[in-house]
């Protein structure tokens, strides 16, 4: 996948990038997403919620260059043409998880089938990263289906150059005849401001609301 170099000296975000990158400022935001119609539609069609949420997340990420901006293995700043999800899968027997990546696809059915194939092949492997090699253009996604939460934060102290978003999903719950699911978004301020966090949340909710258009 193509990695497009950003020339920092000519970048309109240069001042902000240098300031927050040197400070190593990251932040997280958690928002309850209304999945009432989404969950009902997914159930009727016979799909699983987790991969359907992953698909919706990747639609937002791959639509917006800001969420694909990072530093590659050659320590170059730039953005990928496309990112793929690297998601956790829990093993009930070992009480551990594996991280599996699946190729992104704009077509939901194609992505879902690829997900199911990868899951079948790798979910029982007792490795943290069973599907190798892992491409650079992946984004971490995980789900904690046992609890709903109002806040969630990750700290990456040993990788100061990781700029991509990290998404964590919680347990869905019912309130006032609506079904919600918490979604935590971890961002690096060097590339993403509060506006971009709001952009992600709003576009994600919009895709969830329009599930009938893509499922």
Curated annotation (Swiss-Prot):
Keyword tRNA processing: no
Keyword Transferase recorded: yes
InterPro entries, per the entry: CAT-like_dom_sf, Chloramphenicol_AcTrfase_AS, Cmp_AcTrfase
Family to which the UniProt record says this protein belongs: Belongs to the chloramphenicol acetyltransferase family.
Active-site positions on this chain: 189
Organism phylogeny: Bacteria, Bacillati, Bacillota, Bacilli, Bacillales
Keywords, in A-Z order: Acyltransferase, Antibiotic resistance, Plasmid, Transferase
Protein name according to UniProt: Chloramphenicol acetyltransferase
Catalytic activity: chloramphenicol + acetyl-CoA = chloramphenicol 3-acetate + CoA
GO molecular function list: chloramphenicol O-acetyltransferase activity
Induction note: By subinhibitory concentrations of chloramphenicol.
Designated gene of the protein: cat
């Amino acid at each position: 996948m193509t990695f497009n170099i950003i020339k920092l000296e000519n970048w309109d975000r240069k001042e902000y990038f240098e300031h927050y990158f040197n400070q190593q400022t990251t932040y997280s935001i958690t928002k309850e997403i209304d999945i009432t119609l989404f969950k009902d539609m997914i159930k009727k069609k016979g799909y699983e919620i987790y991969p359907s949420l992953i698909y919706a997340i990747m639609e937002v990420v791959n639509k917006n260059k800001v969420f694909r901006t990072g530093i590659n293995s050659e320590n170059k700043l730039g953005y990928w043409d496309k990112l793929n999800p690297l998601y956790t899968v829990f093993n009930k027997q070992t009480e551990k998880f594996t991280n599996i990546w699946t190729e992104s696809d704009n077509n939901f059915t194609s992505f879902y089938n690829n997900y199911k194939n990868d899951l079948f092949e790798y979910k029982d492997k007792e490795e943290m990263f069973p599907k190798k090699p892992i491409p650079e253009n992946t984004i971490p996604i995980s789900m904690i289906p046992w609890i709903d939460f109002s806040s969630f934060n990750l700290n990456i102290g040993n990788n100061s150059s990781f700029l991509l978003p990290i998404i964590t999903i919680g347990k869905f719950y019912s309130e006032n005849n609506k079904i919600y699911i918490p979604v935590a978004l971890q961002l690096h301020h060097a590339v993403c401001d509060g506006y971009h966090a709001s952009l992600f949340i709003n576009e994600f909710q919009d895709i969830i609301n329009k599930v009938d258009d893509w499922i």
